[in-house]
Swiss-Prot record:
Pfam families: VEG (PF06257). Keywords: Cytoplasm, Sporulation. This is Protein Veg. GO terms for biological process: regulation of DNA-templated transcription; sporulation resulting in formation of a cellular spore. Stimulates biofilm formation via transcriptional activation of extracellular matrix genes. Acts by repressing SinR activity, independently of the SinI, SlrA and SlrR pathways. Could also be involved in the regulation of other genes during biofilm and spore formation. It comes from Bacillus subtilis (strain 168). The keyword Cytoplasm applies. The lineage of its organism: Bacteria, Bacillati, Bacillota, Bacilli, Bacillales. Disruption phenotype: Mutants show poor germination in the presence of L-alanine and reduced biofilm formation. Its main location: cytoplasm. NCBIfam families: BflmStimVeg. Induction: Expressed during both vegetative growth phase and sporulation.
Amino acid sequence: MAKTLSDIKRSLDGNLGKRLTLKANGGRRKTIERSGILAETYPSVFVIQLDQDENSFERVSYSYADILTETVELTFNDDAASSVAF
């Protein structure tokens, strides 16, 4: 797991356009699971384009600190059926 925010951003920059599964803390013991594509990375946040058949909205954004504090977990799904997790 990456130790700094810049390491996390660098890792996500290398996975732009890849399909992923998102697991986020929704508060009050709720866990939200969504799937989509890593669309864009910015200096402070990253944007995930969600699958439209499963979700009522198009995009979500999270900060790199959410990954560092383990509020958000990303699992990248490769074509070879292996996965890389953050």
